[in-house]
Amino acid sequence: MQSKKNLLTLHPEKVISKTTIEKHLEYLVMYIEKVNSPQDIKGLNINELNVLADEIRTGVLNRVSNHGGHVGPNLGFTEATVAMHYVFDAPRDKFVFDVSHQVYPHKMLTGRKDGFLKVDDMNAISGYSSPRENSEYDLFEVGHTSTSVALASGLQAARDLLGEKYNIVVVLGDGSLSGGEAFEGLNVAAEAGTNFIVLFNDNGMSIAENHGGMYKSLAALRESNGESSNNIFRALGFDYMYVEAGNNVEKLVEAFRKVKDIDHPIVVHLHTEKGHGYQPAVEDKEAWHWSVPFDLKTGKPKNVDGGESFSDLLGQYLVKKAELDDKLLVVQSAVPAMSGLSKERREALGKHYVDVGIAEEEAVALISGAAKAGAHPVWGTPATFMQRTYDQLCQDLAVNGNPAVINVLGASIYGMNDFTHICFFDIPMFSHIPNLVYLAPTTWEEFIAMEDWAIAQDAYSVALRVPCAVVHSDEEYPTDYSQLNKFHVAHRGSQVAVIAAGGFYQKGEAVLRLLADEGINATLINPRYLTGVDEQLLDELKRDHQLVVTLEDGSLDGGFGERIARYYGPTDMKVLNFGVKKALYDRYDVNDLLRDNHLTETQIVADIKAVLA
């Protein structure tokens, strides 16, 4: 039976019209509103499963258009998710989603549909796999890529050790295969030799286009209907099955039934379409990987910020820099948009551009090698992904002292705020690596001055904490930062010194104004360097200051402020450190976070006055 007024797509080869979604949400009563667990779809026939897939796709579009989120990955894996839950028996069978960019349909089928159908409930549901939502269907908190196979290999080892019987099903995207941990997991799972089903979701895309030699092999498999002898999965020790119609529920159900309860590892290669069912997402797969809230009819953002963005300015800068510097090598790891590198700008960079895929470890080793060979490499990626390559930062780069440049993006409480994507743990990570200089520019102009110096110099590995907000200044900044750890005194006063780092420098200026209203002429310092202290200046402050205040847009534990407090430890100088306390944060409200950590300007001033009293 089909929906009485199902004007949505009833077949996977068709495309949902941009004009139908909102007015047809009211008709989502045939199947999805009655589904509270995968058991509720077991009795449906193929035609009914197709209708269910359409209803799920409509729910996905309802959420992302109102709340923002991952668009293309979820639309492209809708049919496969329906087929998974129809054939396999979760939660007894274990599903592990890589990066979980495609987890929305899964959530709708496992009791969380209200987070997609009802606008008021959307904040309650994470955009990622999350057992914290009290769901037995989500096994792991997942948000970074290439981890699913390794996590699932642990399930495999425990299942086999305990003599249990269930299917382990891994959802792995082709973009995720560019990360080394995916291969480590595949290697281990293949050697175990027991039930281990990898659903390889191949839509020919990462976030942007795929990069790497193995993607030619994957293309050959697609073009030969899986018959190519150049099969990377068989070479790793997996059995293999190819499904060309990766957005066809009937074909997927047929394939999954063949591999259910299999007694050895197998890869089921699904050829899917990223953005399937929503034409704008099909036509521009990169732009629609993730989106802010948008108008379904036009595809345009609902809230347009007409101001400058740091990423756009950075992209312009890098293209212009390549025109002036024949040695410049711009390196990305699958997220070029974060550095303002549109497809047109990537093409303009030409040989100056390298994308290593989702492989941050490779990126750091590559820029170290490139610097050694005389290039001027610059790599940028969000701070949350820097955590994936700490060993390479220490060993391959800093120990060797090669003069590569790293742009640490979004490192701020104003950056990404999902549980798995918190971006303010970078200062403890970078600032304690010997032989690496970590700079904290406060404005766009200061960033350019520091970046130009970092690229031109050949003495240090240099990282820059790129501000989130665009702040302009007519101040003349130094062009040489080789005198390390030399802080800049912007305003000299007495009694209280405020050392405000990076993106919190403007907060420091606001605090100074409030203190002036209280009759306190405080000193304001831009430290510029996060990897050391200006001992001479700190000693000078002891003469006519009784309190030093540090402000940092990051973690207090192991942060910049603790370095200042440690220096003053044996002295009579009082120190107040302001930053974010150690905790697990998830989808926080920035204003709440500021208040909870006493980071509003009025709270800071009140705390300063309390110490001085």
Predicted features along the sequence, with ranges:
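Non-catalytic terminal/interface segments that mediate subunit docking, oligomerization
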Residues: D93, Y278-Q387, Q392-N402, A500-G502, ...
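Cofactor-binding active-site loop characterized by glycine-rich and histidine/acidic residues
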Residues: H70-A192, L328, S333, S342-K343
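A glycine-rich helix N-cap at a beta->alpha junction
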Residues: G115-I125, E191-M205, A398-G410
